[in-house]
């Protein structure tokens, strides 16, 4: 007999004490167990049944009663139910009851069902599975529970409701289509509601199923008004009443009880076949008690399911009707908030149900997402996902999934957090609240597939510890041809995101027409589309992330053909069929030394340019010219990378018809008999009110150096040509030095000394207008191919040098910078010279004891290195060195480096052993020997030099034996290398522990470095090393040291680089020492000290470690006082944060 026959004998439940309920709880029987034991008798074809009476009770009220109910028509289901009338049923889950089960509908408050779970009345609904192994719902003992409907073994009996994990929750009691669903509790009209069990008479109970007609079938259990609903599970509001247990599809709810064949009574839970009914409910073992799902989870699920269902009126048929079209999208699996480590994979998933299928749109912070190579959007059936292989900070924010079809749209969202700290291995993963889509296949009895279970994702590999940026790969210095494409690529490593910045001379490089910068996670590339001269320089790649920074540098040299020779070629010494053509060198050699010059000629007959000859010097003797033609000349410069454009064209020139005279005779006349041209000597003061352009036309540039630039000037009033020397003078100290030099030159009016004729001061420039000397440096003139070097020429040069220096000394002045670069030839043909550059000259008259610490190592006297008082004899030592080189092409003291050179000078060791002196006269050797005396008192003075037998020789009649110039050429090549690649820097700028006091060196007018001597060069002589720690008395305003820019506190990450920068002012140049926690710092690979001549000082600490966390002090000291500035370096070490897992668990 159908169990519903018992409903006719339903009596009002009797209240039982709490103790009795605890005693009898093992005999509770779940009503679904009763259904499982029933056979499948056949029933006649259902007839139309009359509408149910208002008093028809809900069958679940029977299960909540405390007594057995007699069966109708003499049959009883007491044995099937196995219930004692005096026993009270327990709630699902063995939770203690605070009252008896309430009636399902229209019952009084005291008769409503108590919460299903293990909660007290005042508590909200606990998860279905928040208790120990659930007891059967009826009053039967566990061993006496009803058999399942299908002839299954006891092991296949119904498992306790909810005895699975959250992802394995029971399938809803009604997994059928909307037409067959249990109506929401209380969502039908009063006429259709089931009256509560307690308010009905026995005669109003349900008729047996077999006798019922189709019209008399039970209405869905839940078709009552809100007031008649099952009380909420817990203290939930009516809107939170018992919904279908799981995420059932709307089309899978229970069939109507009536009007069905016996075998079809109460369709199985879910989509199971008749023989497999209620399998989803029963297939979990008691030991699989699940962890509770939170209150909020159930709430969301309940509300989800309510929104997913659509109410339909009318009774159900035997077969399930098809789903209604136009179902609004619903999210059966919603997005969950996610927290991932930077660099980990980010995966967001949700499941959307809709008919027809919805169009899915993803947004991040309101911006629509599209599939890229980094972000992958996918939709497989109802499963939608967003996948990002490596999450970055910009991927954090609010993600929203919007589903849209013909019905109203639906959406769900979640927050994604990307953190950069490594996640703890023991940290609890965020709880997964989503569920996977259910299988479309029917479950198999006795297997775990009865309920679709979402498996936990495999544990992710812990992310690598965050690291500061590194540059594991970077190009070496490069030399490229002009016009070539240049690509500088730096590979980067470390924790992303890493910002890459290219800089040149501390200025950031921006994309332009010629330069492109491309950054990626792999590195950064700087591309120069076509290299040009202005692209030369040092390029720095700076990489930074949140943990620190790192930089690397590369020097780029763009080589090209040289610039054309400056100025206009000049024809001189014009004879009957020859002339001497001279010109200036190129203003820029193209990054490679000019190897030769190509001379081109044009005549008035052929009227075309042709190459005449190739020479290495800046002058050439043109022969075989015809007197009836006019000639023009131009010159090209040649280096290893090509030939320059031609220079300006010379003026038209015609050769004379007078007979050619011997060259030597003419030179003798021009040198010995020719009188010095009269010079307009002037006393010059600096003009600060007018500009140089007011009086002179500024033409082409003749040269440049560290001091500034030299331009060709043409005096507007007279048309005379002068040289304008433009000095850079930014500070007041620099502007004071130039007038001092002009003041000395005002006293030096002599034919062998260059003259200053005017001076102007303009903003950052001071301009000196000087007498022009166009013959070039003395030693450059000597190695010219058309110049024959003999001892006779050497005597002529040394005589002029001695005359000029003698005049300087008579004025009480010492030059202190005599060297080949400061001896200039007046023209390209004769032997007349002039001394230039009086920037380091000092007055000895009334100066007392004067000590200096500057000079060029190869030509400086021992007393300068020893920091002893100087005298006029200091210049005589330099004259002796110049004479030694002039006659032999060898340098007496030059070593492989500056230290060796200084050691040789201080020891005054030299000799004439080389074969170069085999052809030199004894008088010449004696002259040199009397100048290169270590004791300056034993040296010849200028007057004695001019009276020496060697300089007294008659140059007209003496034998002119030609000397080899090969050694001189080698010497000049070595000197050129030293000037460009190994120039000595100013004293006070090089030292590992401290900066040594002294004067800043500067280049002479010809570009040769004039540099003070560093302590490193003096380490070979212990007796003089202390001399360089003393202050130097100079004719400059003395200033106490101070910092115009101080160092600042730094905070860096272990493994990166730190840099302290400051700027130091003061004179004499301060001694600078760096300290780390009161300990002086010695320069090494770890600690690098950089100091330029402008006073900028830097301490660079590479590969910072924890030991570098300290206070750093820069101290500057000179004779007037001292100054310090201090900053702190904070080093952050990389440590994994503790307690992170606990924080995540709390969340």
UniProtKB/Swiss-Prot annotation:
Residues 26-41, 943-1006 are annotated as: Calmodulin-binding. ATP binds at residues 702-710, 725. The active site is at 817 (proton acceptor). It is an enzyme of class 2 (transferase). Residues 329-417, 469-557, 1041-1130 form the Ig-like C2-type domain. Disulfide bonds join 350-401, 1062-1114. The modification Phosphothreonine is found at residue 1010. Residues 1-330, 424-476, 644-678, 999-1019 are annotated as: Disordered. GO terms for cellular component: cleavage furrow; cytoplasm; lamellipodium; stress fiber. Isoform Telokin is found in all smooth muscle tested except the aorta. It is not present in non-muscle tissue. GO terms for biological process: tonic smooth muscle contraction. Residues 644-653, 1002-1013 have a biased composition (Polar residues). Keywords: Actin-binding, ATP-binding, Calcium, Calmodulin-binding, Cell projection, Cytoplasm, Cytoskeleton, Disulfide bond, Immunoglobulin domain, Kinase, Magnesium, Metal-binding, Nucleotide-binding, Phosphoprotein, Repeat, Serine/threonine-protein kinase, Transferase. PROSITE patterns: FN3, IG_LIKE, PROTEIN_KINASE_ATP, PROTEIN_KINASE_DOM, PROTEIN_KINASE_ST. Its cofactor is Mg(2+); Ca(2+). Residues 43-55, 459-472 have a biased composition (Pro residues). GO terms for molecular function: actin binding; ATP binding; calmodulin binding; metal ion binding; myosin light chain kinase activity. This is Myosin light chain kinase, smooth muscle. It comes from Oryctolagus cuniculus (Rabbit). The gene is MYLK.
